[in-house]
Amino acid sequence: PFDFTRRRLSVVVSDGKKKQLITKGAVEEILSICTMVDYKGEVSDITRDIKQNILKITKDLNKQGLRVVAVAQKNDITDVKDFSIKDESKMVLMGFIGFLDPPKESAKGAIERLNQDGIRVIVLTGDNEYVTKAICEKVNINTDKIILGSKVEKLSDAEVEAKRS
């Protein structure tokens, strides 16, 4: 299952001859476990510049409302029974996938009706701030007060209350 702490999921697959570890997850997390990148069939060291370029592309996709997941792999896993988180290292970045999960067509109208009735809509999501902002803008939810979960945890009750108003 997906591990929300590590923000990734790994599986071991076998074709009968070799075992392969495949890991998918948050781009930043996958980049942190990759030492190589497969680009157009050529495997090479993943440099700081390559990582920064991937993060820039990912951010641009997020701003368009796309969620992005990275995929990495590692060949020749020795024993599946002894597989552990430690095996999620020195992996090869295979690529990343952007997908759109747009709000339902009825969402914008429903939110407008709630606002007209004096009900303020608050969004809680596991998405990053760029995806959240793009989706909220599509349904006319104010994006001036986006607070990341990691920051909410550090706020006092009084600070949270001040941000709500």
Question: What do the PLM-derived regions correspond to, one by one?
Answer:
Residues 1-3, 162:
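Short Gly/Pro-enriched turn/cap motifs at secondary-structure boundaries
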Residues 9-165:
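Cytosolic catalytic headpieces and adjacent flexible linkers of membrane translocases
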